[in-house]
C-alpha cells in the first residue's frame, strides 16, 4: 500500500503529555515497505524525520518542521518454543501493555513486572525500559532495525544493544536506527521479582496465595494506577527524571543533612538516589505553574493540567533541576526526549 502524507497535523493525540503542536508532514506506516517508502520520499525532499510510537517519552516544545513518522505496525508471533523457553516477536507499533497481557494469557513469564508501562514495543529497547526490578535487557532476545544511513536491515544481539540504565545504543545514536520489531525470551516457569517497591506487600493485601505471573502483573497494575496518573485523564509521560547515580561521598554529605535519604548502593561502588525523594524534599510535590505542574501524589511525574505548552513544561523541569542541584549537588536528567 502506498504511504500517505498529511500536512499540518496536530500531534496532540500522539503524545501522552497532550501538547498541541503541529507536524509539517505526518504519515502513519504499517510495515517495512511503507517505512522505506516514507523515508525515501523524505530524503528526496531533503526533510528531516521524527519517528514516534506511543508518544509516551516525548516533550514537544515547538511545531515540528519535518516528516513525523508514526509507527503503526502490528503483529506478534512465537518464533520458538522448546517447552520451557519461548521466543516471541512483536512489531514496533504494538502497544506495550497489550503485548505484555498477551504473553501472560499464553502462560509466558518474564514481562509481568513491566505491566502498564505506556508506549509501544519499539520504544521499549530505546530506553531499556524498566520497572519493579526488571529491565528490557533481562528478557531481551534480539531486535531488527533499519539503518537510516544505508537502508539496510540489521539484527541486534543483547551485547550489541549496549543497554544501560534507561539507555541503549539506539538512544545514544538518535536518528540512526529505526526499530522495526523486537524479540523476547520468556519462560513457562515463573522467576518472580518481588523485592522492589511494595510488590510483595500488595500481593499479600490482595490475598494472593498462588503466585503466578498474572497475579504479579495485576498487583503491579494496581500499584501503578494508584501512583501514576492516567495520561488519558491527565497529560504526563510517567517518570520525568532518571534516578541519579552519584558517588558514595556525595550521598554521605547529603545524609548528614537529610538522614532519611533514599539510596541504593550499586555494584560499582556508586549509589543510586531516588529522584522523587529529592524533588519531594525540596518542596516541589504538588507544585503548579499555570497548567504545568508536579503531580500531587508522585513527585517524579510532571503533569499537564490541560493547556500547558511544551515550553512551559520544560521551563518547570529546568527550575526543578536547578533547585535540586543547588540543594543537593545532584544533577537530574530528564527521561523524555525533547523536541
From Swiss-Prot:
GO BP annotation list: cell division; cell wall organization; peptidoglycan biosynthetic process; regulation of cell shape
Catalytic activity: UDP-N-acetyl-alpha-D-muramate + NADP(+) = UDP-N-acetyl-3-O-(1-carboxyvinyl)-alpha-D-glucosamine + NADPH + H(+)
Positions annotated as active site in the UniProt record: 166, 239 (proton donor), 335
Cofactors named for this entry: FAD
Enzyme Commission code(s) on record: 1.3.1.98
Residue intervals passing through the bilayer: none
Tagged with keyword Plastid: no
Family note: Belongs to the MurB family.
NCBIfam families in UniProt: murB, PRK00046.1, PRK13903.1
Free-text function comment from the UniProt entry: Cell wall formation.
Name the record gives this protein: UDP-N-acetylenolpyruvoylglucosamine reductase
Organism: Pseudomonas putida (strain ATCC 47054 / DSM 6125 / CFBP 8728 / NCIMB 11950 / KT2440)
